[in-house]
A protein has these predicted regions:
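Nucleotide-sugar donor phosphate/pyrophosphate-binding loop at the beta->alpha transition
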Residues: 68-75, 116, 126-146
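Short hydrophobic beta-strand element within catalytic cores of glycosyltransferases
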Residues: 285-288
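Nucleotide-activated donor-binding/catalytic signature segment of Leloir-type glycosyltransferases, i.e.
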Residues: 237-251
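Donor nucleotide-sugar binding/catalytic pocket of nucleotide-sugar-dependent glycosyltransferases
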Residues: 56, 144-187
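A conserved mid-protein helix/loop that constitutes part of the nucleotide-sugar donor-binding site
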Residues: 16-24, 196, 200-219, 232-235, ...
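N-terminal strand-loop element at the rim of the active site
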Residues: 5-69, 163, 175, 231-233
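Aromatic "clamp/platform" in nucleotide-sugar-dependent glycosyltransferases that forms part
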Residues: 268
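Conserved acidic donor-binding segment of nucleotide-sugar-dependent glycosyltransferases
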Residues: 300-301, 305-312, 320-325
Length: 361
């Protein structure tokens, strides 16, 4: 069996590592695996895991919708299809799902077979400030249409699936939930620190709301805050950071976790936040907004705190952890156990193997 994964870009983040693990492990189970992708653009960086993959580049494939570039991206995808002749075309995130499912008949013709179409929602764009209003309505309309061309819709969290069905995207029988498998990072030995340190790691862009993290930092002048990541708001965040906040830019997650006592997430929208899973595997309690699949990762009051999307609630939860080493230790221990059990790489791989074998029948 041959499976071709398509994603617009392998930017720094959990989705790139998710695909990398599939590409590494599936061939061990007689599933030939190929990855086709475009290039990261602007202030983003490509995930280091991409260097471990033999990827097929689709030069015109980008994150933004562009009718001219998208036309060429589809033609380039057809060339890849003719070469690989996949049994399964597995697209990831909106843009690749758009290119890979808009004209399925031409893909079948290029492959000389009836290709099975799988699409994974690693989240959705409906609550993303960048895709609000009219853009959100257009995306919803597209997704409803594309779902009709899809054999299986994979979600990385139960909440993502509920959100899609509420918007009448797909039918319940099309859906399967496969939580991401995440391996613990190799955490360097922590250096002694005098202050409680709170780490924040994400793309420094609107949907992650880094400015809210700065507002919270101002409320805890005796604590140290570390902001890790890059993006279009990096310069703004650097300019507005208070005295107790270091803006690090792109930083190795393991180093950040080593330097932090608590991890903070201020996102407006999430799918299944891999960084928060990695933080918990590192034994760190997490304070995060209740968006997307966050509540499936962070168990409220057990492995951290899940709050409403406002500065006051986040700060209140954070204060509890800052003031109690006992609570930090207990929640950190619980976080590590929960993440190891719920987000097993082996479970993720086996779920994909079962999915592909079922489609092959």
């Amino acid at each position: 069996m041959r499976v071709l994964h398509v994603i617009a870009r392998l930017n720094v983040g959990g989705t790139a590592r998710y695909i990398m693990r599939l590409a590494e492990e599936l061939p061990k189970h007689q599933i030939e695996t190929f990855v086709a992708t475009g290039f990261v653009q602007g202030s983003e960086a490509e995930d280091p895991s991409a260097k471990k993959l033999k990827v097929i580049r689709i030069p015109s494939l980008g994150r933004q919708i562009n009718p001219i570039k998208d036309h060429f991206a589809f033609k380039q995808l057809l060339e890849v299809i003719r070469e690989v002749k996949p049994d399964v075309l597995h697209t990831h995130t909106f843009k690749a799902g758009y290119i890979g499912r808009i004209r399925t008949n031409e893909i079948n013709k290029s492959a000389d077979k009836r290709v099975k179409f799988v699409h994974t929602f690693h989240g959705h764009l409906f609550d993303d400030p960048e895709f609000s209003g009219l853009k959100s309505l257009i995306i919803t309309s597209f997704e409803r249409r594309f779902a009709k061309n899809t054999d299986v819709i994979v979600t990385v969290g139960a909440q993502v699936g509920k959100d899609l069905l509420e918007r009448k995207i797909g039918k319940p029988k099309q859906f399967t939930n496969i939580p991401p498998g995440v391996e613990p990072l190799k955490i360097p030995k922590a250096t002694p620190r005098k202050k409680i340190t709170i780490g924040w790691i994400a793309r420094v862009t609107g949907v992650k709301n880094p400015l809210r993290a700065l507002e919270i930092a101002k409320q805890f002048p005796d604590a140290q805050f570390l902001i890790a990541g890059g993006g279009d708001m990096l310069d703004q965040v650097k300019a507005q950071a208070p005295h107790n906040t270091k803006v690090l830019g792109w930083t190795d997650a393991a180093k950040l976790f080593s330097a932090s006592d608590i991890i903070l997430s201020t996102s407006e929208n999430e799918g299944m936040p891999i960084a928060l899973i990695e933080a918990q595997l590192a034994g760190k309690p997490v304070v995060a907004t209740n968006v997307g699949g966050v509540s499936e990762v962070v168990l409220n009051k057990k492995t951290g705190f899940v709050t409403r999307k406002n500065t006051e609630d986040l700060a209140e939860a954070l204060e509890k952890l800052i003031n109690s080493k006992t609570l930090r230790t207990a929640q950190g221990k619980a976080a590590k156990a929960h993440a190891a059990k719920a987000f097993s790489v082996e479970k993720m791989i086996q779920a994909h193997i079962s999915l592909y074998k079922k489609l092959a029948k």
